[in-house]
From Swiss-Prot:
It is found in: Plastid, Chloroplast. The record marks K334 as: Transition state stabilizer. Belongs to the RuBisCO large chain family. Type I subfamily. It comes from Chloranthus spicatus. GO terms for cellular component: chloroplast. This is Ribulose bisphosphate carboxylase large chain. The keyword Endoplasmic reticulum does not apply. The disulfide bond which can form in the large chain dimeric partners within the hexadecamer appears to be associated with oxidative stress and protein turnover. It comes from the Eukaryota.
Length: 475
């Protein structure tokens, strides 16, 4: 460069490749209350030091790139860069480390889960220096949390809308999930709600297919829940899946649901995307609709222990983006969930303040300030014999959802719903009387079945059903 063309920005600039750890590994850094903190599980490639791998993650998910660039001189990298401030080995694992990274808040757009994830996990997971990478947890500071609306309504407002207190809510996914006509689908909804359930549900892939267009389904389901409400005197709901190919179509379906006067709609938040989900959550708050969230596709992202994103992070993101319910596994059914880990992210969904607890997979203390809570939904391979454990594990602020465990009853849908409602009421009463559901649960169910033939039939048909596989999601 000639003296005539030299600029201030180029003074001191030296082209070339530097080790990431020279700028992005800062073990003396004291985190700020406004930083977003991340815990990554690193598996470096052979020969790559963990400090270099952690620094690479911090760099590539913030301001860094593979080489020095002269435009670094036009900004303050020290203000905007991510910092790997601590690394620790994972006990019992070879060549695995937890790297803690702090991100300045100014790196992120306010109220945008999409931008947060694009920055933190958007590019770095394909980095060649890493054999595998998993985002285990995030600490979202109150300063960022306050830029989000969060759930449309939250737990207390939902209970007030439904006028239901002191017990878990009961639901059922209509089966078969695909192939029914809209009228037959509505019939199944009516039978389940009449039998005592609070909610029925579209499955995640029920959108608007040739055998059942969305508008027909919405109309027949609305008719079913109004009829069930008139007969039972209870407020009922059906999760009408508004997920669609475009945001405009999704909102159109939510508008029609509101015009029908139903209380709740549904969205597949991972396949639909965070931008669409946040838009729908805002519409639901403005128009008095509850929002049920299905986590379809989550296992693609969260199931591998050393690569991907843990579901506790996806759960935190959902609370920020917005949803009143979200599926959270069961611990006891067919879908995976180890007890302590599951209860860790269940607390992250419901509570205002959650302490750091590594035994439950919680790497950071999380303060949600005023963000409303989300009801966890337990579903997948559960039936009446699981009711005591589910009541004890999840407590009152939850939705217990029995699909096959309702529709598979030998006498039909309504008796299946009756069996589940009787089992739940018996467990809640036993708990309130001080009985130990973990130890006496089966006895409680047997006692209740003596005066409920529907429950007795359900107990008989599902007495041998078990899903005994080792959980992969462990600390």
């Amino acid at each position: 460069m000639s003296p005539q063309t030299e600029t201030k920005a180029s003074v001191g600039f030296k082209a070339g490749v530097k080790e990431y750890k020279l700028n992005y590994y800062t073990p003396d850094y004291e985190t700020k209350d406004t930083d977003i903190l991340a815990a990554f599980r690193l598996t470096p490639q052979p020969g790559v030091p963990p400090e270099e791998a952690g620094a690479a993650v911090a760099a590539e998910s913030s301001t860094g790139t593979w080489t020095t660039v002269w435009t670094d001189g036009l900004t303050s990298l020290d203000r905007y860069k991510g910092r790997c401030y601590h690394i620790e080995p994972v006990a019992g694992e070879e060549n695995q480390y937890i790297a803690y990274v702090a991100y300045p808040l100014d790196l992120f757009e306010e109220g945008s889960v999409t931008n947060m994830f694009t920055s933190i996990v958007g590019n770095v997971f394909g980095f060649k220096a890493l054999r595998a990478l998993r985002l285990e947890d995030l600490r979202i500071p109150p300063a960022y949390t306050k830029t989000f609306q969060g759930p449309p309504h939250g737990i207390q407002v939902e209970r007030d809308k439904l006028n239901k207190y002191g017990r878990p809510l009961l639901g059922c996914t209509i089966k078969p999930k695909l192939g029914l006509s809209a009228k037959n689908y509505g019939r199944a909804v009516y039978e389940c709600l009449r039998g005592g359930l609070d909610f029925t549900k579209d499955d995640e892939n029920v959108n608007s297919q040739p055998f059942m267009r969305w508008r027909d389904r919405f109309v027949f389901c609305a008719e079913a829940l109004y009829k069930a409400q008139a007969e039972t005197g209870e407020i009922k709901g059906h999760y009408l899946n508004a997920t669609a190919g475009t945001c405009e179509e999704m909102i159109k379906r939510a508008v029609f649901a509101r015009e029908l006067g139903v209380p709740i709609v549904m969205h597949d938040y991972l396949t639909g995307g965070f931008t669409a989900n946040t838009s729908l959550a805002h519409y639901c708050r403005d128009n008095g609709l509850l929002l049920h969230i299905h986590r379809a596709m989550h296992a693609v992202i969260d199931r591998q222990k050393n690569h991907g994103i843990h579901f506790r992070v996806l759960a935190k993101a959902l609370r920020m983006s917005g949803g009143d319910h979200i599926h959270a596994g069961t611990v006891v059914g067919k879908l995976e969930g180890e007890r302590d880990i599951t209860l860790g992210f269940v607390d992250l969904l419901r509570d205002d303040f959650i302490e750091k607890d590594r035994s439950r997979g919680l790497y950071f203390t999380q303060d949600w300030v005023s963000l409303p809570g989300v009801l966890p939904v337990a579903s997948g391979g559960i039936h009446v014999w699981h009711m005591p454990a589910l009541t004890e594990i999840f407590g009152d602020d939850s939705v217990l959802q029995f699909g096959g465990g309702t529709l598979g009853h030998p006498w039909g849908n309504a008796p299946g719903a009756v069996a589940n409602r009787v089992a739940l009421e018996a467990c809640v009463q036993a708990r309130n009387e001080g009985r130990d559901l973990a130890r006496e649960g089966n006895e409680v169910i047997r006692e209740a079945s003596k005066w409920s033939p529907e429950l007795a039939a359900a107990c008989e048909i599902w007495k041998e059903i078990k899903f005994e596989f080792e959980a992969m999601d462990t600390v």
